[in-house]
Amino acid sequence: MIKEEFDPRQVMTERYYEFHHSYNETPPTVEFHQHPFYEIFFFISGNLNYIIEGRSYKLRPGDILLTSNADIHRPEVRPGRPYERIVIWLADDFFDHLKRFSGEDFTACFTDAALKDYRLIRPDDGTLIRLRQLCEQMSDAKFSKKLGSAALTQAYLIEFLV
């Protein structure tokens, strides 16, 4: 999987979604922020607490956090271990497109997490293996120049959401 340099921006440059796999030896500083898109944070390694709407989550490798499009959040990265994660940003337009296509509201998991005030998902081993495979496939398709690679990236993303 291709690892990208950390980009501190909190603005999407793509219309529907963005997929970033980032790795840092030195922890970046990220202030509290919010943005008008949804975020899936897939923690791979490091020493991290993540704060969402005032609630702190002590993360373990493989943990997933769901951040809604208005949640105030930030990672608290402590030094000592490399910090690796996958971040997926999803615009309202992406979910609108999926709803027109499937008739289903894929924002429901984000809404439910916010209502329960618990945004942490800790997948079982089998699910974790499959989610990592899908991230690998999304990364490969994202950087591919082959015909249909953008559609394939989106298909893997939808499978990840399901």
Model feature map: region roles:
Residues 51, 97-98:
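Residues that scaffold the ATP/ADP-binding catalytic core of kinase and kinase-like folds
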Residues 70-94, 101-102:
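Ligand-binding loop in jelly-roll beta-barrel domains
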Residues 105-159:
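Amphipathic alpha-helical segments enriched in hydrophobic/aromatic residues interleaved with Lys/Arg
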Residues 1-64, 71, 79, 103-119:
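Generic protein-terminus/edge-of-domain signal
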